[in-house]
């Protein structure tokens, strides 16, 4: 059972898909400052050790997407891809937050990432016009 999705809530960098992919691109000094802060261990899977968070961010950068797999809420999966809008650094992320069992019955993580990439490619020109 999930403890609930939280629309509109600001998710922490160490336990959110969007946070991981956005912070993966950040300047080392800024990242170091953030990693020195205390981070809450929401679930058993939540990484709070700065070295573990760093590994997760590096993994996100290498894969091209951020993922949180029950790190915030039990039974919840989130995946996010960066949106660059012509810049070197992402300005936002687009992603999904879903009940893990339900979404993985229909799609693999790779399929979700592919669909999110297509969505990003479709919305980027619209966002660039704004």
Annotated model-derived regions:
Residues 1-37:
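Amphipathic alpha-helical effector-binding/dimerization core
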Residues 17, 21, 30-34, 52, ...:
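Non-catalytic alpha-helical scaffold/packing segments enriched in small hydrophobic residues
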Residues 20-21, 77, 93-95:
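Residues embedded in well-ordered beta-strands
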Residues 83-86:
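Sensor-regulatory modules in signal-transduction proteins
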Residues 91-130:
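Juxtadomain coupling helices with adjacent low-complexity linkers
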């Amino acid at each position: 059972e999930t403890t609930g999705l939280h629309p509109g809530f600001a998710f922490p960098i160490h336990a959110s898909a969007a946070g991981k992919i956005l912070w993966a691109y950040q300047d080392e000094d800024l990242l170091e400052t953030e990693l020195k802060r205390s981070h809450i261990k929401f679930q058993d899977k939540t990484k709070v050790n700065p070295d573990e968070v760093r590994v997760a961010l590096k993994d996100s950068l290498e894969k091209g997407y951020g993922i949180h797999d029950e790190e915030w809420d039990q039974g919840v999966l989130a995946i996010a891809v960066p949106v660059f809008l012509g810049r070197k650094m992402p300005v936002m992320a687009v992603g999904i937050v879903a009940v893990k069992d339900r979404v993985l019955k229909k799609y693999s993580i790779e399929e979700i990432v592919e669909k999110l990439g297509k969505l990003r490619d479709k919305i980027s020109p619209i966002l660039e016009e704004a």
